[in-house]
C-alpha cells in the first residue's frame, strides 16, 4: 500500500477539518461526538493532520477531546507520531504544544528516525532547540543505519546546527553501522565548513571506517582538494593503510580517480615503501587501472618506478601488463611507461598475442624487447598457439628480429599449430640438424600431413644455410633494424635475402616495412 499519497475518500470528516484548519467545522463535529482517532489510508489520524498542516487551534481542540498520552503518541503506518510531522515541517508552536502535552521527544519511526533528526534534516534550528530543552537525546542512532543528527548536519553543512549539537554534548566520534563518523561524512562529500568545525572541536582526523578507509582516503578518492589540504594540515596520516591487505593509501585513490592536484599534495608526504615494496601495490598501478595518463606521468616524473612490483592483488606482473585491459587509453599509457624506462619482456609480448594487439607486438620488438633468454617461455608459447591463426601479423616480425625458432619447436607448438604455421617456423631453421626429440615430434606430425613430410625431406639450400650463418653472427638488436642490414657491404638482393624477403613473399606475408605501424 502507498503510504505517501493521501486518498481523500479515506480521510474522516474530523481529519479533513484538521487538515484544512477549519476550526468552526471541527468544533461542530466534536460536539456531535465524532471520533478523533479514525485513520486514513496512511494511518494518519486528525492529530497528525493538524500537526503537519500547522493547525494550532485544531490541535488544541483535538488534545482537549482526547487528552490521553496514548492519543498524542499515536503513530501512522510508517511509525510517525504528530511530533515527528510537526518537527519535520518546523512548526515550533505545534511542537511546543505536543511536548507540553506529553509527547515523547525521543519517539522513533519504523526506520528509527527521531523528531530531533527530522528537525536537523530540514534545517529547523528553532524546533531543534525546543526538542533539546525537553530532553531529546542528542546522541545515539537517529536512523536505521545508525546515521545520527550530527552525521546529517555535517552532510548538509549546516554550521549553526553542527555547533549547537556539539555544545549540547553530541559525540563527535559517533559511528554509523559502517563505522563512519561525522568528520568522515564531511570529508566524503566535500563539506569544508563542516570539516573545519569538527576538526576544531577535536574530532579525530585519522578515524577509520569498518573497511579501514580514512577521511583523507575518501576525500582523495572523491577529489575534494580543499578538504585534503585541511586534513593534511591538521595531522591526517597519508601512510595509514586503508584496507585489510595493508597496501591501499590515499595516494592510490587520487591516482586511480584522476585527481592530479591531490596527487601533487600527497606525493611528497607519502612513504615510498609503496613504490616497489614487497607485498605492496605501487600507485602507478592505480593510475594505469584508472586510465589516467596525467596521473601516471606525475608519478613517474616524481621518481616512481614504471616497473613497480609484481601485483598479486590485480594479477599482473607489471603496469605494462595491466595496461592491456585499458583499451581506450592503451597506447598513451604504454608510451608513457616506455618513456620513463619500463622494461619490456616476453610476458608483454604474450599479452599482445592474448589480446590480439599485433601492432603493439611489433612496436615492442622495435623498442628493444629482449628475445632471450626468457623466463616465461610456457606463457608465451601458450598465447602464441592461441594466436597462430593470425601468425602472419606477428610471427614473421619475431623471427626476422632474431628470435630463436627452436624455442617454439616444442611439443605443444608442433602438435597444435596449423601445418602452414609450422612449416613457416621451420623456414627459419636448418630443419636437417634439429635435435632428435624435435625430429621425432615432427615426424609424428608429418605422418598425416604430406606437405610437412615433403618439406622436412628436402635439404636446405646452401644459400639458406649461409643466411642462417650470417644472421647467427649478428645480435638481435641489429637484426631488428632494416637500416643496419642495408648498410652491410653486400648487394641489395642479399640484403633482402637476409631479411627473408623470399620466404615472406612465398607465404604472402606483407612486406615488414609496410606494416610497421605503432
Swiss-Prot record:
Pathway field: Protein modification; protein ubiquitination
Induction / repression: Upon sendai virus infection.
Main subcellular localisation: cytoplasm
Single GO biological process annotation from the record: intracellular signal transduction
Superkingdom classification of source: Eukaryota
Pfam family, one: Ank
Keywords recorded for this protein, A-Z: ANK repeat, Cytoplasm, Repeat, Ubl conjugation pathway
GO terms under cellular component: cytosol
ANK repeats: 9-38, 42-71, 78-107, 111-140, 145-174, 178-207, 211-240, 246-275, 279-308, 315-346, 348-373
Stored CDD domains: SOCS_ASB3 (cd03722)
Entry's localization field: Cytoplasm
Positions of the SOCS box domain: 441-504
Family as reported in the entry's similarity comment: Belongs to the ankyrin SOCS box (ASB) family.
Subunit text: Interacts with ELOB and TNFRSF1B.
Function: Probable substrate-recognition component of a SCF-like ECS (Elongin-Cullin-SOCS-box protein) E3 ubiquitin-protein ligase complex which mediates the ubiquitination and subsequent proteasomal degradation of target proteins. Recognizes TNFRSF1B. Plays a role in the down-regulation of antiviral innate immunity by targeting MAVS for ubiquitin-proteasomal degradation. Also destabilizes TRAF6 by enhancing its 'Lys-48'-linked polyubiquitination.
Domain-level remarks: The SOCS box domain mediates the interaction with the Elongin BC complex, an adapter module in different E3 ubiquitin-protein ligase complexes.
Name of the featured protein: Ankyrin repeat and SOCS box protein 3
Amino acid at each position: 500500500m502507498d503510504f505517501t499519497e493521501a486518498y481523500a475518500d479515506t480521510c474522516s470528516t474530523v481529519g479533513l477539518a484538521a487538515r484544512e484548519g477549519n476550526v468552526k467545522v471541527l468544533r461542530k463535529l466534536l460536539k456531535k461526538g465524532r471520533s478523533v482517532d479514525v485513520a486514513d489510508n496512511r494511518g494518519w489520524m486528525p492529530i497528525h493532520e493538524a500537526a503537519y498542516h500547522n493547525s494550532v487551534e485544531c490541535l488544541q481542540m483535538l488534545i482537549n477531546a482526547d487528552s490521553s498520552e496514548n492519543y498524542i503518541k499515536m503513530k501512522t503506518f510508517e511509525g510517525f507520531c504528530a511530533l515527528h510531522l510537526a518537527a519535520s515541517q518546523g512548526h515550533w508552536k505545534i511542537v511546543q504544544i505536543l511536548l507540553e502535552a506529553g509527547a515523547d521527544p525521543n519517539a522513533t519511526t519504523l526506520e528509527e528516525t527521531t523528531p530531533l533528526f527530522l528537525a536537523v534534516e530540514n534545517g529547523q534550528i528553532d524546533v531543534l532547540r525546543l526538542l533539546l530543552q525537553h530532553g531529546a537525546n542528542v546522541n545515539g542512532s537517529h536512523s536505521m543505519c545508525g546515521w545520527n543528527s550530527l552525521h546529517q548536519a555535517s552532510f548538509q553543512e549546516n554550521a549553526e546546527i553542527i555547533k549547537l549539537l556539539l555544545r549540547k554534548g553530541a559525540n563527535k566520534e559517533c559511528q554509523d553501522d559502517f563505522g563512519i563518523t561525522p568528520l568522515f561524512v564531511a570529508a566524503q562529500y566535500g563539506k569544508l565548513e563542516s570539516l573545519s568545525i569538527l576538526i576544531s572541536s577535536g574530532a579525530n582526523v585519522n578515524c577509520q571506517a569498518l573497511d579501514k578507509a580514512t577521511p583523507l582516503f575518501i576525500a582523495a578518492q572523491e577529489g575534494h582538494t580543499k578538504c585534503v589540504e585541511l586534513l593534511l594540515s591538521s595531522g591526517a596520516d597519508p601512510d595509514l593503510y586503508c584496507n585489510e591487505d595493508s597496501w591501499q593509501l590515499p595516494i592510490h585513490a587520487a591516482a586511480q580517480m584522476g585527481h592530479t592536484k591531490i596527487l601533487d599534495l600527497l606525493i611528497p608526504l607519502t612513504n615510498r615503501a609503496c613504490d616497489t615494496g614487497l607485498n605492496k601495490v605501487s600507485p602507478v598501478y592505480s593510475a594505469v587501472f584508472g586510465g589516467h595518463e596525467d596521473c601516471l606521468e606525475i608519478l613517474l616524473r616524481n621518481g616512481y618506478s614504471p616497473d613497480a612490483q609484481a601485483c598479486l592483488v590485480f594479477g599482473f606482473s607489471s603496469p605494462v601488463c595491466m595496461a592491456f585491459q585499458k583499451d581506450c587509453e592503451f597506447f598513451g599509457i604504454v608510451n608513457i611507461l616506455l618513456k620513463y624506462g619500463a622494461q619490456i619482456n616476453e610476458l608483454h609480448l604474450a599479452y599482445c598475442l592474448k589480446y590480439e594487439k599485433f601492432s603493439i607486438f611489433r612496436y615492442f620488438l622495435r623498442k628493444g624487447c629482449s628475445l632471450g633468454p626468457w623466463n616465461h617461455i610456457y606463457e608465451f608459447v601458450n598465447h602464441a598457439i592461441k594466436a597462430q591463426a593470425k601468425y602472419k601479423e606477428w610471427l614473421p616480425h619475431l623471427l626476422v628480429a632474431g628470435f630463436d625458432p627452436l624455442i617454439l619447436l616444442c611439443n605443444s607448438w608442433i602438435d597444435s599449430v596449423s601445418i602452414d604455421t609450422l612449416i613457416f617456423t621451420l623456414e627459419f631453421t636448418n630443419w636437417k640438424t634439429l635435435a632428435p626429440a624435435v625430429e621425432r615430434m615432427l615426424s609424428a606430425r608429418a605422418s598425416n600431413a604430406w606437405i610437412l613430410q615433403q618439406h622436412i625431406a628436402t635439404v636446405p639450400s646452401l644459400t639458406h644455410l649461409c643466411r642462417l650463418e650470417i644472421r647467427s653472427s649478428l645480435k638481435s638488436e641489429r637484426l631488428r633494424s632494416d637500416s643496419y642490414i642495408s648498410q652491410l657491404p653486400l648487394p641489395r638482393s642479399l640484403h633482402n635475402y637476409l631479411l627473408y624477403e623470399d620466404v615472406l613473399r612465398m607465404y604472402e606475408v606483407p612486406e615488414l616495412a609496410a606494416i610497421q605501424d605503432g
